[in-house]
């Protein structure tokens, strides 16, 4: 795990400083896994980590951040994947790309978990369409309540890295 942590710091996927998050909240660090996903060797390591953790024969993730992660992991595991889209106002209006059977178990992958709301949205979309979702995986858990929210909704969160494990981290 130390190798991946070092890679995330090296490529600038984890930065320390003064940042304003999407929520408007200030933070002393910023995590952007999309930055890491553009580096083939780092993406390969992330996919390898997920491949050792995933227990279902199909995975899913929310566009945009999770897409390179689910594609790389699906290729490594030779399993199909589902992309969960954000709101659609054109085309077929479908929120899901990919197929699965009602009652099929699907694991969800996310890049970064903070509050857990993004993962929960993906999980709820999948469940509303008949999937069984019990587990979610992320590259980095910011440890800001996301795991608790997911647990309350029947989802076990399995992070590759918890932010408190990262060298240089301080709240």
From Swiss-Prot:
Coiled coil: none annotated. One of its GO terms (biological process) is 'de novo' UMP biosynthetic process. Its EC number is 2.4.2.10. Orotate binds at residues 114, 142. The keyword Chloroplast does not apply. Its cofactor is Mg(2+). CDD domains: PRTases_typeI. 5-phospho-alpha-D-ribose 1-diphosphate binds at residues 85-86, 88, 90, 110-118. GO terms for molecular function: magnesium ion binding; orotate phosphoribosyltransferase activity. Pathway: Pyrimidine metabolism; UMP biosynthesis via de novo pathway; UMP from orotate: step 1/2. Keywords: Glycosyltransferase, Magnesium, Pyrimidine biosynthesis, Transferase. Transmembrane segments: none annotated. It catalyses: orotidine 5'-phosphate + diphosphate = orotate + 5-phospho-alpha-D-ribose 1-diphosphate. It holds the Pfam family Pribosyltran. Homodimer. Belongs to the purine/pyrimidine phosphoribosyltransferase family. PyrE subfamily. Catalyzes the transfer of a ribosyl phosphate group from 5-phosphoribose 1-diphosphate to orotate, leading to the formation of orotidine monophosphate (OMP). HAMAP family: PyrE. This is Orotate phosphoribosyltransferase.
């Amino acid at each position: 795990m130390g190798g991946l942590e070092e890679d995330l710091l090296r490529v600038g996927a984890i930065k320390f400083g003064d940042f304003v998050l999407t929520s408007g909240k200030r933070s002393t660090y910023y995590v952007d896994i999309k930055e890491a996903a553009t580096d083939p060797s780092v993406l390969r390591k992330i996919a390898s980590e997920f491949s050792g953790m995933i227990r279902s024969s199909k995975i899913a993730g929310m566009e945009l951040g999770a897409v390179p992660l689910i594609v790389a992991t699906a290729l490594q595991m030779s399993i199909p994947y589902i992309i969960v889209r954000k709101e659609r106002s054109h085309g077929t209006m479908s929120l899901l790309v990919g197929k699965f059977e009602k009652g099929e178990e699907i694991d969800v992958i996310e890049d970064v978990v903070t509050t857990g709301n993004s993962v929960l949205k993906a999980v709820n979309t999948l469940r509303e369409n008949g999937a069984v979702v019990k587990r979610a995986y992320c590259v980095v858990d910011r440890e800001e309540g996301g795991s608790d929210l997911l647990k309350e909704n029947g989802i076990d969160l399995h992070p590759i890295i918890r932010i408190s494990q990262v060298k240089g981290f301080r709240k």
